[in-house]
Amino acid sequence: GGLKFDVAALLYINSLYILLVLLPLPLKYSPGYQKNAKWVFLISNSIGAGLNIMDYAYYPFTLKRTTGTIFSQFSNEQNFAGLLFNFLVDYWYLLFLFVGLIYVMAKLYDRIQVVRPEAIRWSFYGIQFLALLFVAFLFVGGVRGGWAHSTRPITLSNAGDYVKAPEEMNIVLNTPFSMLKTLKAIALKEVDFYTSEALNKI
């Protein structure tokens, strides 16, 4: 079950990179284009990896996956820089792990050599366009969790289909998916109907 959410998260994170690679343009074989595509790949996946690594330390305090509500939770924090510094000091080994992952990703990426076709004919555009459509088909199925007509884009609640207890949903989910699916979540605002003086009189 967790694989379905991992695939969806990876597709969301790499959506821009996938588009850059599959666009049927001869320009994509230029060194400048390839360099920019590499940076898009590294930055996008570094964010995803960073969120998962961060949650390794954050989870014991919240007992749930980090969601988009974290931004509202820290929006009024006056000493955020101090908290971040203390986090990096306490979990310095996670920082090394994060840097190491980025280094490995960059090295593995450099092993892939993109070769420009000797001659770009009309068949090039046709094949590239068909490849784009095929990957788009796979992409839609991946982010939706399937291709069935009744299938909708999977959300956090779908993790309950693969566990026996609600607290086990965090094992199935991953942090990037949880963050992306809750960025537009509506935060409930605190409303005061009575003043403190009125409450004391009741």
Residue ranges and their predicted role:
Residues 1-188:
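Transmembrane and membrane-interface helices of multi-pass
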Residues 113-117, 190-202:
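Extracytosolic and intramembrane catalytic regions of membrane-associated proteins
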